[in-house]
Amino acid sequence: MKKTSLFVAEIALSHEGSIGNACALMDLAKNNNIDIVKFQDHWARYESSKDELFRVPIGFDKTRYEYWERTEFDQTEWSYIYDYAKKININIGFSIFSPQSFFRQKKLGNHIWKLGSGELLNNELIDILIKELNKKDTVIISTGLCEYSYALNIAEKFSSSVKEVFILDCISEYPCNYADYSFKTWLDQSSKLKKISYGLSDHSGEIWPTIFSWSYGCKMNEFHITFDKKMFGPDQKSSLDPSDLKNLNSAREAFNIISRNEKKKISSLKKNMINFFGRSIGLKNSLPKGHILRREDLLMRKPNGGFSFKDLENIIGKKLKIDLNYKEILKSEHFEK
């Protein structure tokens, strides 16, 4: 279990266009020790058209253009969100979907960028990022709609020019089913990478894929968050709610404690337990004064504190100087000198 694995809470558009909700979701992430909160900057005017439809209709906005437009923030609102992230001391990042949304967030000082799997087909945006990003920037890439080799090729274009690159295994279904994961095969490939870190972007709405990924040493684990899975919006069922986040945080804290010590240490309590459950040489039956001890007279009795098993050969042949009850453990004063 790797303590260095980053947890990314994808707020996306679960805020439904409300700055209050956006800040409250950041609080939810912060209170559960999330490392990075991530938003999506869908700027309808520069990204979409009236012909862009939902894969699964949500019953309120007829087109994605309407949805993006209804939930988007302007520059002033994004600036407020940035300031709030600084106030609560949590890192913030963005999925960007157009050159305009990139330059808007760059102007505000963002340095954590995600290219969703759909944007790996957006050559215009990729070319701009390659030119504009530097060693202050982190790039996150999802495989989702693309073959691993294609996503890796894009990731390698950034590896020499930015601070760090992550490539995340992703299934672009909301929610996705456990049976659809091919994570172990993907992990075997990604573990060979040198300049690119690997991880999981999960849409299951459960904590188990993240725990599985983390246990295999993945460097980044991303998941959507929400106040309630019954809330309106296309991502809510695929998100972790406050109860999920609490359980995930508890697991993370427990695993960190468990994995912290490389060498087992025996505490004073454990030493007392060893004494309690240890054994000493005793008698099978009560024996009279003057009896010379034989092997068949002896056995090991609890607790520890008398002669140990390694002393057995030295005890054989000793002569008792008193009558001795079998309930006693043998001590030096029981023998004639």
Placement of each model-derived feature along the sequence:
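Catalytic cores and adjacent flexible loops of soluble metabolic enzymes
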Residues: M1-K337
